[in-house]
């Protein structure tokens, strides 16, 4: 059965500001019916790539976290590391980026946990019941360790998925680095030779012996490679790369099945704001003008 969707516009006046309006919306939509008492509550959001200003302000996260804490819950803000090079590729840089963009205990009232760990390989394989494109989703461990899951996102364009919102925030956002590779890539990783220093880290972490060091450079044997993506996470020079060759249709199908893996069988609540609808996702280190006004 389809869930009810509750809507409130972004108009405000001196009687009620937008944070108060969001609190009223959460109450009306039944978020208060969830048993938060002594529960670990993951609030999944995007902290924004440094340089981007379209991400949701920390004030929104604080409103949600306060709602949870008032009902005895233990909220934390979370996201997983990125597959590409940037300010959120590992947990240390990711947390620095989050704090640079205003997220922290003082501003949001709760802690930050990067769900897939230091290098993006702390994951749980979650069976996707009825999955056609994904049989076992690779999800950041802290996401699955949480008792309650809340997604907080804003709508925006996306150059591959078309648009990004609740599903992309959950499906792609909760995937570990290997999970993101599975969604974006139809094949297996390769080594960019000019970046490789022949350190052998990829070979050490591979359970299948796929990376081979030849003449001081790594080469991946695709007959042995199973596409787990651990070599991408471990490479100190970002030399192990994917082809980004999955079709848009299959990418969206995989995102949907990854989302199913995250939300199945536990209390969830989803908040989407049609605000700062930038043409590209918040993973960019810049944001263009919104393509539509706030709703």
Task: Map each language-model feature to its residues.
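Extended, low-polarity segments enriched in aliphatic/aromatic residues
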Residues: 2-61, 66-79, 84-295
């Amino acid at each position: 059965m389809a869930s009810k969707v509750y809507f409130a516009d972004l108009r405000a006046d001196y009687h009620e500001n937008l944070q108060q309006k969001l609190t009223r919306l959460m109450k009306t939509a039944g978020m208060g019916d969830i048993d938060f008492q002594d529960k670990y509550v993951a609030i999944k959001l995007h902290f924004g790539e440094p340089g981007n200003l379209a991400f949701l302000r920390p004030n929104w996260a604080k409103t949600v976290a306060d709602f949870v804490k008032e009902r005895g819950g233990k909220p934390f803000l979370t996201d997983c590391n990125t597959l590409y090079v940037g300010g959120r590729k590992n947990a240390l840089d990711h947390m620095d980026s989050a704090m640079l963009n205003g997220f922290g205990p003082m501003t949001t009232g709760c802690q930050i946990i990067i769900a897939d760990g230091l290098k993006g390989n702390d994951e749980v394989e979650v069976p996707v019941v009825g999955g056609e494109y994904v049989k076992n989703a690779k999800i950041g461990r802290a996401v699955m360790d949480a008792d309650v899951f809340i997604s907080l996102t804003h709508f925006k364009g996306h150059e591959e998925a078309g648009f990004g919102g609740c599903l992309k925030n959950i499906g792609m956002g909760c995937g570990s680095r290997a999970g993101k590779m599975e969604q974006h890539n139809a094949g297996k990783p390769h080594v960019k030779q000019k970046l490789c220093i022949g350190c052998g880290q990829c070979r050490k972490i591979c359970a299948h012996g796929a990376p081979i060091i030849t003449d001081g450079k790594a080469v991946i044997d695709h007959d042995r490679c199973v596409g787990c993506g651990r070599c991408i996470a471990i490479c100190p020079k970002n030399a192990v790369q994917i082809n980004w060759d999955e079709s848009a249709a299959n990418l969206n199908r995989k995102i949907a099945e990854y989302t199913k893996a995250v939300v199945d069988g536990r209390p969830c609540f989803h908040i989407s704001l049609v605000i700062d609808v930038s043409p590209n996702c918040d993973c960019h280190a810049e944001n263009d003008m919104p393509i539509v006004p706030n709703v």
